Amino acid sequence: MDFNLNDEQELFVAGIRELMASENWEAYFAECDRDSVYPERFVKALADMGIDSLLIPEEHGGLEAGFVTVAAVWMELGRLGAPTYVLYQLPGGFNTFLREGTQEQIDKIMAFRGTGKQMWNSAITEPGAGSDVGSLKTTYTRKNGKVYLNGSKCFITSSAYTPYIVVMARDGASPDKPVYTEWFVDMSKAGIKVNKLEKLGLRMDSCCEITFDDVELDEKDMFGREGNGFNRVKEEFDHERFLVALTNYGTAMCTFEDAARYANQRVQFGEAIGRFQLIQEKFAHMAIKLNSMKNMLLEAAWKADNGTITSGDAAMCKYFCANAAFEVVDTAMQVLGGVGIAGNHRITRFWRDLRVDRVSGGSDEMQILTLGRAVLKQYR
């Protein structure tokens, strides 16, 4: 595997550096985090660069640049302080519809290309069904030529502002043998109620409870095939977990560099604290974690581009990077001392964000279970 960037990838990364240097984005991010607002202006700037077309096939007007390119872009964005967690649907959200959607559904989602606006997200988790997805109780019921959706979802990302969601529900006519199907739902429909939740971190992307009370749908609103809901979302889970891991790495790298600059400038006892062995030890351990994360992610990206990535690979990336990145940020905060906990330093935001990622997108525990099964399966 050669992870040297090619000319096209170098151009993308250079473009990211130029964009991030074009204005004081950190002030904008801090404002969006404080107000729990999606940074649409920033995402629009990325869309103008073609970032939302990186994985779209060329036949649909995309760049089909591959996951190594996505990894390079996400790593650089994160290193420079961008909240890449708001971009999870940007590289792959269009492709999901190109694979699974009807032409009408595809047209509705592709209309958001280049806008930077949030377009859709999945609604799977429920109050009684988190990691235990098989306990879903939201139902769809056919009656008089229509389909009616009833139930509730919780912790649904982006759902305060997305115009569409894809809802996983079980067939109300098959209580003994669950049939799970997804439905493409316009959020403006009658019977939908959204309650925005407050979060510890990841505040630039909304998280909501959604209730469905006899929401009327048509058969044409089915997303994918009936009964194929679980199979479809498995691929989405892997994609999301890889992107979460990329975000974790980039954020950790940003805090590492902030802390390194501080350690070389902060003087105590007559010299820079970076000359103290205890501080050097912290940076050695942070560097080991960062290097391990980077190599793991680039290998996974290469596997994705070559069709060999597995759910185990995605789980490994998600688990290791979520934990290692949080440890890096926590250590960097220790280096910064009072500046890191009492001021307005961005590390406080990063610390909150990364703690959430050990739960969201699949908990640490579920990643371990997925990875353990995948590892042992190779030796059966």
From Swiss-Prot:
Catalytic activity: 4-(trimethylamino)butanoyl-CoA + oxidized [electron-transfer flavoprotein] + H(+) = crotonobetainyl-CoA + reduced [electron-transfer flavoprotein]
BP GO annotations: carnitine metabolic process
UniProt keyword Transferase, yes or no: no
Localization terms from the record: Cytoplasm
Annotated pathway: Amine and polyamine metabolism; carnitine metabolism
Primary localization: cytoplasm
Keyword Oxidoreductase among UniProt keywords: yes
Disulfide bonds: none
EC number per UniProt: 1.3.8.13
GO CC term, one of those recorded: cytoplasm
Keyword annotations: Cytoplasm, FAD, Flavoprotein, Oxidoreductase
Entry cofactors: FAD
GO MF entries: acyl-CoA dehydrogenase activity; flavin adenine dinucleotide binding
NCBIfam families: PRK03354.1
Function (record text): Catalyzes the reduction of crotonobetainyl-CoA to gamma-butyrobetainyl-CoA.
UniProt record similarity statement: Belongs to the acyl-CoA dehydrogenase family.
Subunit: Homotetramer.
Name this protein carries in UniProt: Crotonobetainyl-CoA reductase
Protein's organism: Salmonella typhi
Name of the coding gene: caiA
